[in-house]
Each structure stands twice: as C-alpha cells, then as structure tokens.
A protein has these predicted regions:
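FIC/Doc superfamily catalytic core
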Residues: 1-175, 179-243
C-alpha cells in the first residue's frame, strides 16, 4: 500500500498548485473525515451531516450537549495541527499538553494525573502517578527518534503506531487519553507531509486493538488503517484534479 501512496503523491505533485476552491474543499473533506472517525472511536453516534451542521453553527436536535462541544474541540485541534505542521513544528512534549488542552478544555499546563487509574473497557491498570515522569521521558525519546524517520518508509507508519501506543500506555491525564494518542499520531504524520487521518474503525474493533497493544506491548497493525485513510484521501484528490 505504501508503494501506491508514493505513486499518488508523485502524481499530485505534478498537478500543484491546486485552484484555491479545490484546496479548500480538500481541507474541508479532510477535517470532516478526521473529526468523524475520531468521534466514532469515542463512542459518538453523530453523522457526518450532523457534524457539518455543528461546524456551520446549527446544533442538531436530540443530541447530548457534550457532542457539539467535542466537535468544536476537534475542529480547533485540527486547525491547530494544520497551522503547526505548515510551520514545520516537530512533535514534542509541550504539544502533548497543548493538544490535551484543546480536546478537554483544561488548562494547557495541567499536571499529569495524581491518582491511580483503572480503565475498565480496556481492562488496564495505568502506570502509577509516581511512574509518569519516567514514562513521559520515554515518550519524549520517541518523539526525538521520530524526527529522523523517513516519511516514505514503513518505519514512518510503525513510528506513528508507536507514538499512539505509548500515549495509550502512559495515560498521562486520565481523560481523553485515547483521543490524545490519536491526535499526536495524526500530527506526527501531518508533519511528515501526509493528510490528517484517524483510523476508520468501529469502536469495538479499536478497543480490541488497544487491549492487545496493552497486553503485548507490540504493534497491532494500526498503521495499516492509517495508510488506508491516507490513500483514500489521495485518491479523492487525484480524481478531482484530473484534467
């Protein structure tokens, strides 16, 4: 699949610059799909149409108030990812706190959790709070290692999965850590030049994958789902820029 992605990127490189209206359309589609996929994995039942309504200022009927709040939080995170990636800012520890702030609304300097945490739907006991400084140092080392990874290599998608899995393993804040893991994974790939993507999976399928990750500490193929989403977005861009 990576070989096909490379071919698509070369094809699109021969078609730039895109007309402004097409560039905006691609970004809108990318944003909507990214928000939708993440909401599905958070247990939301919002449709793409309802998400679009929220982003246009209309609150759908018969939805919990938390749903439109999360849509706006994810939109803010997406737009900030775009801004930072265009500036070439590398994934770093400060970014973890910043994106946690965007998706939860808590202060960006909020300390790591200070209580023990049992995540029942993943059957997982997170590291003790006293272990968090060491665990976050491991995440920092992973970010530094990620800087040297070739964007057009399988290692890039393995690294994306490693970043996701490490944030999940550590659970630094005790709330929305799965979403935070996916945001950091998305940003890593964006900074490498890819579209923003989140796995197109059912919530149960994703949870089962996370359970395997936490039990084995091994990669479980999440990178393949990310490649699939990237390829679908690139195919759309090729289709709509064909002469």
């Amino acid at each position: 699949m990576l070989r096909t992605i490379k071919k698509r990127i070369i094809m699109l490189g021969n078609r730039v610059p895109f007309a402004p209206e097409k560039q905006k359309y691609f970004e809108d589609v990318e944003r909507l799909q990214w928000i939708y996929n993440n909401l599905v994995l958070e247990g939301s039942s919002l449709t793409k149409h309802q998400i679009q309504d929220v982003m246009e200022g209309t609150i759908p009927q018969n939805v919990a108030i938390e749903e439109p709040i999360m849509v706006e939080a994810l939109r803010s995170a997406f737009d900030e990812m775009y801004f930072l990636a265009e500036k070439g800012v590398k994934p770093c520890m400060e970014m973890v706190g910043y994106f946690n702030h965007l998706i939860t609304g808590y202060d960006r300097d909020i300390p790591y959790r200070k209580t023990s945490l049992m995540v029942h739907h993943w059957d997982y006991v997170a590291p003790h709070p006293a272990e968090l400084p060491e665990k976050m140092t491991e995440l920092d080392s992973l970010f530094k290692e990620a800087e040297g990874v070739d964007a057009m290599s399988e290692a890039c998608f393995e690294m994306a999965e490693k970043i996701h899995n490490k944030v999940i393993e550590v659970m630094p804040y005790g709330e929305k850590d799965g979403l935070l893991a996916r945001v950091m994974t998305s940003y890593f790939l964006m900074e490498k030049g890819y579209p923003a993507v989140a796995p197109d999976m059912k919530e149960q399928e994703y949870n089962e994958t996370v359970i395997k990750v936490l039990k084995t500490r091994e990669l479980q193929g999440l990178g393949e789902f990310l490649k699939k989403e990237i390829l679908e977005h690139l195919d759309l861009m090729i289709q709509l820029t064909a002469h």
